[in-house]
Each structure stands twice: as structure tokens, then as C-alpha cells.
């Protein structure tokens, strides 16, 4: 799950086709959980610098269920789409924060999205 999400979020940042995977189609369905108009507000609330990736912990939004976990993935993907170049961003911190927030739901996410762990 970690590798899939890393590749997906990096792909959303720059659409590098070498990162594309057919599993991304299901992850892209999560986009409907976050309005495009909200992305600018979310970025502002994250107080990011030019080299930051999505810093979800700064949103103060708890992850209490699988739907919250899906929303965090969607937020990460949409913020990644709208921020700077991949090579300029410190992704490691962003992924550490995301995974810490949603790791409890990894198995449930895989079953919900793909029908298996």
C-alpha cells in the first residue's frame, strides 16, 4: 500500500508516465471527496514552504475511520498536483505524516478499493 500511494502521489505531482499504474484509476475516484475549490484553502492551512510536500498534520483533521483515510489520500494527491516540481519537494516528511495518519486503515483501504489485501 505504501509503495502504491507513494507512486500515485508522485505521479499526481508531475504526471510522469513511468510512475503510472492501472491501480491509480481507483485512487483517482477518491478525488470526489475533496472539492477543487478547497485545495487552495488546504494549502494555506498547511503553511507550506516552497519545498514542502503535503503536510496533513497541520490541518488538525483526525483520521477516525476509512472515509477519513480516503480523504487524506485525496488531499495529498490534489495538493501534490498543485505544488512545485517533484525534485524540489521534500517528499519523505509528507509521506511519513500521511502513513502515520492512515496506516491503521491500510488493509481496509486495499479491500475497499481493490477487493483484497
Curated annotation (Swiss-Prot):
Induction: Expressed in the early phase of the viral replicative cycle. Disulfide bonds: none annotated. GO terms for biological process: symbiont-mediated perturbation of host apoptosis; symbiont-mediated perturbation of host defense response; symbiont-mediated suppression of host NF-kappaB cascade. It comes from the Viruses. It holds the Pfam family Poxv_Bcl-2-like. InterPro entries: Orthopox_N1, Poxvirus_Bcl-2-like, Poxvirus_sf. GO terms for molecular function: identical protein binding. Keywords: Early protein, Host-virus interaction, Inhibition of host NF-kappa-B by virus, Modulation of host cell apoptosis by virus, Viral immunoevasion. Bcl-2-like protein which contributes to virulence by preventing host NF-kappa-B activation in response to pro-inflammatory stimuli such as TNF-alpha or IL1B. This is Protein OPG035. It comes from Vaccinia virus (strain Western Reserve) (VACV).
Amino acid at each position: 500500500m505504501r509503495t502504491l500511494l507513494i507512486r500515485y502521489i508522485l505521479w499526481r505531482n508531475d504526471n510522469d508516465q513511468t510512475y503510472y499504474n492501472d491501480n491509480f484509476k481507483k485512487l483517482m475516484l477518491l478525488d470526489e471527496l475533496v472539492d477543487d475549490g478547497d485545495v487552495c484553502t488546504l494549502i494555506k492551512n498547511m503553511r507550506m514552504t516552497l519545498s514542502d510536500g503535503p503536510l496533513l498534520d497541520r490541518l488538525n483533521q483526525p483520521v477516525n475511520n476509512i472515509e477519513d483515510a480516503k480523504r487524506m489520500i485525496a488531499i495529498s494527491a490534489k495538493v501534490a498536483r498543485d505544488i512545485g516540481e517533484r525534485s524540489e519537494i521534500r517528499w519523505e516528511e509528507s509521506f511519513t505524516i500521511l502513513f502515520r495518519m492512515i496506516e491503521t486503515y491500510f488493509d481496509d483501504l486495499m479491500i475497499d478499493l481493490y477487493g483484497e489485501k
